[in-house]
């Protein structure tokens, strides 16, 4: 053989896709180079140990290659492998080769976790997990890899598709994008009591199985329930929480910007600026919508931009800049604007108040003494 120098991961075909491994033969060197090694000392490049890259380790089309018959030997990354295991990365699947290209090979394990674990199904890249297994998490599988895959009973879909709420779960239904699990058994246990859904009840219908992209459309069919178990990221339009005055975290700011208010709904605390408290009563249809939310008696410039320090990120009124219009100061329209004190920052509604009754005379012709 010619004396050339190449790394063990070379894809050079001059040796028939075979490179030399150290220690396989007395004539092989320890320098990870091909140095006049006899062909019997060489192995297929995809079976080379670390630091070989999986670009040459696990070609998608190597179904019958020797590298696909030895990738499942017992190793740290595949502790449960058996000799009869067939690596899914060697089959045509939604896990493309690109998801393996940058992963270094583990010792005696060429297939990185992103493409295959012990329990990963090859075609749709949806793992069937047992216990607290975390296989296929942080994988390159997009949500599309799950839309056409039927849910298996007791299946554990990876985070990219739909988390399952178990006793140890802490992020159930967050950033969920599952679409096809509506009637599957794997969706029936989503609302078990857990830290993330402490108020769940047995009759709860998991909304994360219905296009849970955290938009109002995903929740319109969910009925409101007292202490409802719908995750914060995807509250139904009709199930906006009723918040107490001392509550400051009952909902995220995004829950109000795009929701259409129902009659009698309660505006969450996070959506109440000090200078603007929309009252949802009667036939009101504008609460919780994006608006400047200025009280009728304040000018547009009465409030500073939202404070990043404020717990509720709400605007704060400047006492000196709230200039009221005459109709805001008293029950009668004859009140003069100059009769009113500047608005108080402490007032929840930030309303100007009249300083002295004498200023607001019964008629508009009365001279003001302010």
From Swiss-Prot:
Residues 36-363 are annotated as: 30 X 5 AA repeats of C-C-X(3). Restricted to a narrow region of the hair fiber cuticle, lying approximately 20 cell layers above the apex of the dermal papilla of the hair root; not detected in any other tissues. Keywords: Keratin, Repeat. The keyword Lyase does not apply. InterPro entries: KAP. One of its GO terms (molecular function) is identical protein binding. Sequence repeats lie at residues 41-45, 46-50, 67-71, 89-93, 99-103, 109-113, 114-118, 119-123, 135-139, 145-149, 155-159, 160-164, 172-176, 186-190, 208-212, 218-222, 228-232, 233-237, 238-242, 250-254, 255-259, 265-269, 270-274, 275-279, 287-291, 297-301, 302-306, 321-325, 339-343, 359-363. GO terms for cellular component: cytosol; keratin filament. It holds the Pfam family Keratin_B2_2. In the hair cortex, hair keratin intermediate filaments are embedded in an interfilamentous matrix, consisting of hair keratin-associated proteins (KRTAP), which are essential for the formation of a rigid and resistant hair shaft through their extensive disulfide bond cross-linking with abundant cysteine residues of hair keratins. The matrix proteins include the high-sulfur and high-glycine-tyrosine keratins. Belongs to the KRTAP type 10 family. Interacts with hair keratins. This is Keratin-associated protein 10-7.
């Amino acid at each position: 053989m010619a004396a050339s120098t190449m790394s063990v991961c070379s894809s050079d075909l001059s040796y028939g896709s075979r490179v030399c491994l150290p220690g396989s033969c007395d004539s092989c060197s320890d320098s990870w180079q091909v140095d006049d090694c006899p062909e019997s000392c060489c192995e297929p490049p995809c079976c080379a140990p670390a630091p070989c890259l999986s670009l040459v380790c696990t070609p998608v089309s190597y179904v019958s290659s020797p590298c696909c018959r030895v990738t499942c030997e017992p190793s740290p990354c595949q502790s449960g492998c058996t000799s009869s295991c067939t690596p899914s990365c060697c089959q045509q699947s939604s896990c493309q080769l690109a998801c393996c290209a940058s992963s270094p090979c583990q010792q005696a394990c060429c297939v990185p976790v992103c493409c295959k674990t012990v329990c990963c199904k090859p075609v749709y890249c949806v793992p069937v997990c047992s216990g607290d297994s975390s296989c296929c998490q942080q994988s390159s599988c997009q949500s599309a890899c799950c839309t056409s895959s039927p849910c298996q009973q007791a299946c554990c879909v990876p985070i990219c598709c739909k988390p399952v709420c178990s006793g140890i779960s802490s992020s159930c239904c967050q950033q969920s994008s599952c679409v096809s699990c509506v009637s599957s058994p794997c969706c029936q246990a989503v609302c078990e009591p857990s830290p993330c859904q402490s108020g769940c009840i047995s009759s709860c219908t998991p909304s994360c199985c219905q296009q849970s992209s955290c938009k109002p459309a995903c929740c319109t069919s969910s009925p409101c329930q007292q202490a409802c178990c719908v995750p914060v990221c995807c509250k139904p339009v009709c199930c906006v929480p009723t918040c107490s005055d001392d509550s400051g975290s009952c909902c995220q700011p995004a829950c109000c910007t795009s929701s259409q208010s129902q009659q009698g709904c309660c505006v969450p605390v996070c959506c109440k600026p000090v200078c603007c408290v929309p009252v949802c009563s009667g036939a009101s249809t504008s609460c919780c919508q994006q608006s400047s939310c200025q009280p009728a008696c304040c000018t547009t410039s009465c409030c500073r931009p939202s404070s990043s320090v404020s717990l509720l990120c709400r605007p704060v009124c400047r006492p000196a800049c709230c200039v009221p219009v005459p109709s805001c100061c008293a029950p009668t329209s004859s009140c003069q604007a100059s009769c009113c004190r500047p608005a108080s920052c402490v007032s929840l509604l930030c309303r100007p108040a009249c300083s002295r009754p004498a200023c607001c005379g019964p008629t508009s012709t009365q001279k003001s003494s302010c």
